[in-house]
Amino acid sequence: MMNLYLNMLKIAHRGYTKYHSDNSLQAFYDAIFYKFDMIELDIQLDKHDNIMIMHDIHIDYQFVETMSYEEIKRQYPNTLLLSSFFQQFDYTNTKLYFDLKGGNKLTKILHDFLVKYNINIENMWFASFNLNHIDFLQNANPNYKLGLITDNLFTLDIMQNIISKYNIQFVCFFWVLLNDKMVSFLKSNNIMTFVYTLKDLKLLPWIQKYNIDGIVTDIYYD
């Protein structure tokens, strides 16, 4: 039987979370152990502008950006600071896809952090739903590899405007939006197409029809 995943990057959604909580150090280690090609992780700010690895932008309708890291840790003890992640994880040998969450100021603080600590960004991609994030990073350092995450199906002229302006390496679509015209257009411009999030292998017969480059997945597969 043909391997449906042969040419697709396996992207561990918030790490491999079958046995550990989302965005935890243990989930990131498991993604390596189970040989995922890339790890997707979410980052945002607390109220003191610490960069945390965390997905949800509110906790019981209180915005995370109004809470301290200590408050968040009391409810979610596995929450990591980005600084701790870089100290404890061999990020130079793993492809990382950062999903930027929250307000616009995240990118300024992130850029300053990467410069201050001389972080090797060779295996890093920075992506967001928020074009303000992409715009800032593009101007701060043209060498940043950027991605657009979207629930929108743009017309080709709008997508052309976006990829002409920004150094977009991939576009990650919600899986229901896949269509041949957009995938072919992106490939013709040397831009990868990713989809999110594979939660059930029953989706594969549909996804495999498209010549995409990567799947953000909760599921381990061979």
Regions found by a protein language model. Give the residues of each.
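Phosphate-group recognition and catalysis centered on beta-loop-alpha active-site segments
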Residues: 1-222
